[in-house]
Amino acid sequence: MGSQATTYHMAMYPWFGVGHLTGFFRLANKLAGKGHRISFLIPKNTQSKLESFNLHPHLISFVPIVVPSIPGLPPGAETTSDVPFPSTHLLMEAMDKTQNDIEIILKDLKVDVVFYDFTHWLPSLARKIGIKSVFYSTISPLMHGYALSPERRVVGKQLTEADMMKAPASFPDPSIKLHAHEARGFTARTVMKFGGDITFFDRIFTAVSESDGLAYSTCREIEGQFCDYIETQFQKPVLLAGPALPVPSKSTMEQKWSDWLGKFKEGSVIYCAFGSECTLRKDKFQELLWGLELTGMPFFAALKPPFEAESIEAAIPEELKEKIQGRGIVHGEWVQQQLFLQHPSVGCFVSHCGWASLSEALVNDCQIVLLPQVGDQIINARIMSVSLKVGVEVEKGEEDGVFSRESVCKAVKAVMDEKSEIGREVRGNHDKLRGFLLNADLDSKYMDSFNQKLQDLLG
């Protein structure tokens, strides 16, 4: 069993969030590349959305799961893209109700190990049927170390905002901390029920602490100290699959966007995008656009229509439309983000700090402005701005979390000014990190190590 040629049969059952499904499937492809067989458990009508990403169809097979009906859950809903954000707890409740089906499937498949995330009941189920369980996270280990560390947990004591504003006592980088408004949101999650009668905080803590091992898509060069901290705190082996970098796009940019970007000089355009699931309030949406306008630079903003507005057009004040005519585009549909970030005219990326978006930014030349909205995005922003110093975060009010057009403009100008101390620092750090991430041997090195640690775990 300890030979290098040993291969295993693995099951994967990720949370029904789009980013979680694609993140797990990326790992499935990497493991299949090492010869392992993967059974990927997925809602039956969602399977078609991942089939085109299957690089090893002879080793990766889909196992359809029927999502149970739950009162309040839209009929046919299978992923987070099918339900409004306030209803995602119902989707979690539905996933929890698949427990008996999952037990039957895993017994029938005769797998050696199951990878999971939000299903906190899977480790005990796995032990019951004699297989190992590995918690695989699509978010940063720093997030788990900061928010979930066992040294934070005192029996009978509720975590407060003040607790969450500072790092745990033995955290490796005490300079990383939360602002008051951010700590308030994190503290709320410690009491917020998420699927049945369990809080989101307790669900994830149980999922992590009951596992046989923890796995992350990162590398020691970026988050090594936080991985060591988690390994010590949870007393679990930590497996690193290497950073989740974007696969080079084989498509070409739409001609209309290529023509528009081509009108501007190299490195002069701001590209702003907040992902497929982030919707801003109308006042924030407008303030962000006013901030981009205030820079005096051309910009392309790919944003969803805000709350309280039926369309992008209806959300933009007439005065702003006049000011940005010819040098600013606000687009409400999907665009080829990788191709925008690669375009020579784009010099700055204003991001909501989703990890996939930041990974795309890190392997390109554009400078990074960080404007996180919720949850792990906040921690991602601290990694980029405080730990790695490769970007600048937009300043917000300590208590209310509100940003201004002036703070947006200030952050953009800071990274775009090559002569300023901040501009030189983030550019230099970004250049070094990009060179490291683009090393052709990086992925194989980490997957060799991941494979060996997995063999050690499975015996």
From Swiss-Prot:
Pathway it works in: Pigment biosynthesis; anthocyanin biosynthesis
Coiled-coil intervals: none
EC annotation from Swiss-Prot or TrEMBL: 2.4.1.297
Ligand binding (UDP-alpha-D-glucose): T138, V335, Q337, H352, W355, S357, E360, D376, Q377
GO molecular function: anthocyanidin 3-O-glucoside 2''-O-glucosyltransferase activity; hexosyltransferase activity; UDP-glucosyltransferase activity
Organ and tissue specificity: Mainly expressed in the petals and tubes of flower buds at around 24 hours before flower opening.
Reaction catalysed by this enzyme: an anthocyanidin 3-O-beta-D-glucoside + UDP-alpha-D-glucose = an anthocyanidin 3-O-sophoroside + UDP + 2 H(+)
Family annotation (InterPro entries): UDP-glycosyltransf_plant, UDP_glucos_trans
GO biological process terms, semicolon-separated: anthocyanin-containing compound biosynthetic process; pigmentation
Amino acids binding an anthocyanidin: H20, G375
Keywords, sorted A to Z: Glycosyltransferase, Transferase
Catalytic residues (positions): H20 (proton acceptor), D117 (charge relay)
Matches recorded under Gene3D superfamilies: Glycogen Phosphorylase B
Function summary: Glycosyltransferase that mediates the glucosylation of anthocyanidin 3-O-glucosides to yield anthocyanidin 3-O-sophorosides. 3-O-sophoroside derivatives are required for the bright blue or red color of flowers.
Family, similarity comment: Belongs to the UDP-glycosyltransferase family.
Protein name as catalogued: Anthocyanidin 3-O-glucoside 2''-O-glucosyltransferase
